């Protein structure tokens, strides 16, 4: 992009991306090109005798982060002085506690579910009205919020609870380890259920209502504002130059949307990863009267995002590939192509509608009472010409699109914001058939960007804004995104999929009754149900 200086000036930005399964340090030039990346997998291990726990190992994970930073610098063949700024993003919901001297003392990952009993306990407060109060203020329910975890600590680890002086998110912990400064940003801290959607600041009254300490809330700074600078100690550990600016990052989904240029009211994205997120930018804070949809602060000040989640969509495809497609994996390896590409080629020869096969995996999002039916395929036939791996694979792709369309319809119903097009990103967007199916099911154009994993790019944009290399978050996101292809909906298929969606919804409702009666096991249940 001509408005940005080229890499010959020696200006680069670093994003630290702390995901559920790995941490990455990614270096970008000012045109948004990825120059290098260091990556390390990490594990969140359960605490012995604490069901559902997933501890975040602060010591090991900081060492892994430093390893990634050095790896990225080495791969890019750049001196540390070339990095003009660094920012961090992370999985949301994961929290870190610090003692009163600012030392990190405890952390859990986003998938930590130890506080199921505490979720139920908090739901009963104020004649079962506390969760509604939390949702109307923060856009979050209790199942994934920080308050049940804090209550668990008060019950079972009072030593840590008493020591705690500050709470942040995992992205903020990375920034703290670099700079020594403590703060949170609205996009990530909003997922604690303790931040006001309107003011974009903490709502300590919610903690007080729950009988929890409200004196552990750190300062709130917007994404893209300067937090501090890399300390001499951190520089020695990670290889960055002491004094390098450290800028506020944010939540992975919101920064991913920034990297995709999804920054204006009404814009919509489907992020196709392990989970699929359907995200719609809302012009002002509003919540869903039915509490089906999550509402998060965007990284763009004043804007919120309605977010629905399809559960384990990418994981389901991986399970199908690994459980049933050993032959295709070997063939793809010999051909030098991706197994999913081969499966898509096979599925493309199956008629739209997949001969009526109905996958039962993720439900539409019901944030207040979030659980799913038992995984299954319904309406199979014994005709091997019509019911085979290609048919089942196509049915899974169609079903993922149907669940996404249902979630987008729920958002439109309460917000009045109806998508006119969809940005499709993440690993799922690599599938050309899947992209076309998503266009056909939703009935609107689907745009696929060149950079499909845009979280780190969004984080780098925040770093650049924080030191004045970019003018503003929204403008830069729009300027840096590049499009690979666009899919127009097939109207004939749209009508077919509308009927399939209606049938699937009815069958799924029946399948939930089997879980309710204890005859089958839910794919997943939220803590406290």
Swiss-Prot record:
Enzyme Commission code(s) on record: 2.7.1.189
GO biological process: carbohydrate metabolic process; quorum sensing
InterPro entries: AI-2_kinase (IPR033676), ATPase_NBD (IPR043129), Carb_kinase_FGGY (IPR000577), FGGY_C (IPR018485), FGGY_Carb_Kinase (IPR050406), FGGY_N (IPR018484)
Catalyzed reactions: (S)-4,5-dihydroxypentane-2,3-dione + ATP = (2S)-2-hydroxy-3,4-dioxopentyl phosphate + ADP + H(+)
Highest taxon in the source lineage: Bacteria
Keyword presence, Transferase: yes
Protein function: Catalyzes the phosphorylation of autoinducer-2 (AI-2) to phospho-AI-2, which subsequently inactivates the transcriptional regulator LsrR and leads to the transcription of the lsr operon. Phosphorylates the ring-open form of (S)-4,5-dihydroxypentane-2,3-dione (DPD), which is the precursor to all AI-2 signaling molecules, at the C5 position.
Record-linked NCBIfam families: PRK10939.1
Protein name: Autoinducer-2 kinase
């Amino acid at each position: 992009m001509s408005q940005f200086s080229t890499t010959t000036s020696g200006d680069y930005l670093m994003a630290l991306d702390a995901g559920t399964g790995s941490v990455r340090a990614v270096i970008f030039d000012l045109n948004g090109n990825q120059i290098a990346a260091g990556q390390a997998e990490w594990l969140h291990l359960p605490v012995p005798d604490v069901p559902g726990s997933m501890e975040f190992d602060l010591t090991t994970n900081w060492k892994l982060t430093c390893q990634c930073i050095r790896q990225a610098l080495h791969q890019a063949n750049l001196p540390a002085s070339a990095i003009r700024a660094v920012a961090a993003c992370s999985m949301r919901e994961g929290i870190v506690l610090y003692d009163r001297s600012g030392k990190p003392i405890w952390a859990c990952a986003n998938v930590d579910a130890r506080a199921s009993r505490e979720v139920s306990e908090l739901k009963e407060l104020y004649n079962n009205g506390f969760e509604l109060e939390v949702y109307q203020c923060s856009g979050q329910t209790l199942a994934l919020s920080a308050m049940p975890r804090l209550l668990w600590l008060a019950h079972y680890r009072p030593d840590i609870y008493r020591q705690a002086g500050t709470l942040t998110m995992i992205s903020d912990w990375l920034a703290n380890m670099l700079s020594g400064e403590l703060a949170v940003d609205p996009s990530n801290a909003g997922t604690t259920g303790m931040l006001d959607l309107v003011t974009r600041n903490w709502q300590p009254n919610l903690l007080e209502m729950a009988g929890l300490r409200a004196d552990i809330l750190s300062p709130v700074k917007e994404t893209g504002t300067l937090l501090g600078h890399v300390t001499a100690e951190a520089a020695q550990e990670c290889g960055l130059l002491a004094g390098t600016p450290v800028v506020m990052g944010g939540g992975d989904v919101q920064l991913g949307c920034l990297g995709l240029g999804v920054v204006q009211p009404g814009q919509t994205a489907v992020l196709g990863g392990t989970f699929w997120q359907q995200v719609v930018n809302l012009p002002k804070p509003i919540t869903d009267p039915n509490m089906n949809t999550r509402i998060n602060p965007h990284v763009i000040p004043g804007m919120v995002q309605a977010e629905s989640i399809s559960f384990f969509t990418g994981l389901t495809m991986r399970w199908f590939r690994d459980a049933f497609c050993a032959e295709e994996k070997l063939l793809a390896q010999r051909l030098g192509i991706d197994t999913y590409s081969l499966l898509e080629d096979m599925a493309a020869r199956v008629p739209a509608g997949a001969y009526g096969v109905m996958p039962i995996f993720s439900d539409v999002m019901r944030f207040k009472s979030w659980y799913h039916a038992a995984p299954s395929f319904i309406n199979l036939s014994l005709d091997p010409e019509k019911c085979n791996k290609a048919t089942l694979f196509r049915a899974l792709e169609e079903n993922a699109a149907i669940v996404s369309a249902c979630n987008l319809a729920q958002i439109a119903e309460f917000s009045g914001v109806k998508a006119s097009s969809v940005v499709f990103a993440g690993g799922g967007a690599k599938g050309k058939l899947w992209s076309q199916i998503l266009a056909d099911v939703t009935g609107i154009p689907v745009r696929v960007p060149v950079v499909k994993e845009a979280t780190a790019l969004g984080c780098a944009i925040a770093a650049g804004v924080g030191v004045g290399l970019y003018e503003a978050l929204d403008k830069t996101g729009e300027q840096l995104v590049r499009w690979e292809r666009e899919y127009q909906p097939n109207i004939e298929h749209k009508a077919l999929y509308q009927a399939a969606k209606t049938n699937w919804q009815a069958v799924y409702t029946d399948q939930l009754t089997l879980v309710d009666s204890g005859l089958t096991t839910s794919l997943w249940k939220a803590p406290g149900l």
